[in-house]
């Protein structure tokens, strides 16, 4: 991920410079507002786990939320601070392992993350920490996909091949251009979630941690660009939305 930081940052910079920042911002803000009606953004503590070059942290800080952003990789955090510009002082950036969050219990009202869970070595441990740091009544928003399932599943492999064929005759950019695909596949082979049926796996685990969770398997239709839809047609993004029980409920 250290080597990917500059390239990944470029992708985030494009998102920040286009309508994607509005699409993603509205998608997240609507769910936060539904969970905390009447509360102003400045009173809501948000943790962005695996912030990477800072896309979520930046758009949420711009909306006025109290934002803390963590990433395991120092170079990603450097890119995030650079991308944040004048907003950098409004975001609490910290280098931290997503599987071992060093925050006190109940520190945040909202936890957001995107394309992180799939590459964790112990995602169940991560979920235990994520739910621990959420305050009672807190909201979890996890945007992810079953990335690299084609390494283990024949049907997914056929879908991946179709994606590459359709991409070759399209007018959109290949998202893998400049990416060390072998290195990314090596990561996927060492982590457990590319082999799992998701988001069903996530919902089962979160239930064990007392989180009422549901999955929106069509969220990709709202948040993905044409380019993303063609590149990743066989691996659609889903949203896991979880709610931690309130004090009276627990």
Q: Residue locations for each model-derived region?
A:
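A short glycine-rich, Lys/Arg-flanked "PGG" loop and its adjoining helix->strand segment in the class I
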Residues: 124-136
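Conserved class I S-adenosyl-L-methionine
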Residues: 1-42, 55-59, 139-177
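Class I SAM-dependent methyltransferase SAM/SAH-binding core
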Residues: 45-49, 53-100
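A short SAM/SAH-binding and catalytic strip from SAM-dependent methyltransferases
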Residues: 110-123
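A short acidic, Gly/Pro-enriched loop at the edge of an enzyme's catalytic core
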Residues: 99-110
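Short alpha-helix
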Residues: 193-210, 215-216
